[in-house]
Amino acid sequence: MTDTFWAFIGLILFLALLFYFKVPAMALRSLDERAKRIAGELDEALRLREEAQGILAEYQQKCAGIEQDVQEIITAAKHEAEIIVAEARVKTEEYVKNRNKLVEQKIAQAESDAIQEISSSAVNLAISSASKIINNELGAKKANDLIKESIIKVKTNLH
């Protein structure tokens, strides 16, 4: 009996003990459980991936909707800004027109006042000149009566 024979017998006994204690069945059961656990984890990972893709698609839709809303808001803001600028331009033009009209009215009033003052001065000068001429050529009493009468006529004609 050689050493190889005894090693073979030890191997046979070892394998017999393994089968006696049902080690291969336990190993198979353990491998089956591990395979089921891995399959469950794969199913869970697949489910989570699909859920993540659904959430991603939902957020992409929301993002697209938000971008569209932002564009609409920007467009509306630009439109309102254009309206405000146009209204401001119209109001400014009206203000300038009103100021010009007011200045023209003031100028016209000043011209009217100047003409009236010049007319009044001319009338007063004419009256005083006529008064001096009449006083020099007519008598004092007759000259005063004539002056009073002329002043009344001039005042009624001017006013």
Curated annotation (Swiss-Prot):
Transmembrane region(s): 5-25
Entry-linked InterPro entries: ATP_synth_b/b'su_bac/chlpt, ATP_synthase_B_chain
Keyword Transmembrane: yes
Keyword terms of this UniProt record: ATP synthesis, Cell inner membrane, Cell membrane, CF(0), Hydrogen ion transport, Ion transport, Membrane, Transmembrane, Transmembrane helix, Transport
Topology in membrane: Single-pass membrane protein
Role summary: F(1)F(0) ATP synthase produces ATP from ADP in the presence of a proton or sodium gradient. F-type ATPases consist of two structural domains, F(1) containing the extramembraneous catalytic core and F(0) containing the membrane proton channel, linked together by a central stalk and a peripheral stalk. During catalysis, ATP synthesis in the catalytic domain of F(1) is coupled via a rotary mechanism of the central stalk subunits to proton translocation. Component of the F(0) channel, it forms part of the peripheral stalk, linking F(1) to F(0).
Protein name: ATP synthase subunit b 1
Gene source species: Bartonella bacilliformis (strain ATCC 35685 / KC583 / Herrer 020/F12,63)
Gene of this entry: atpF1
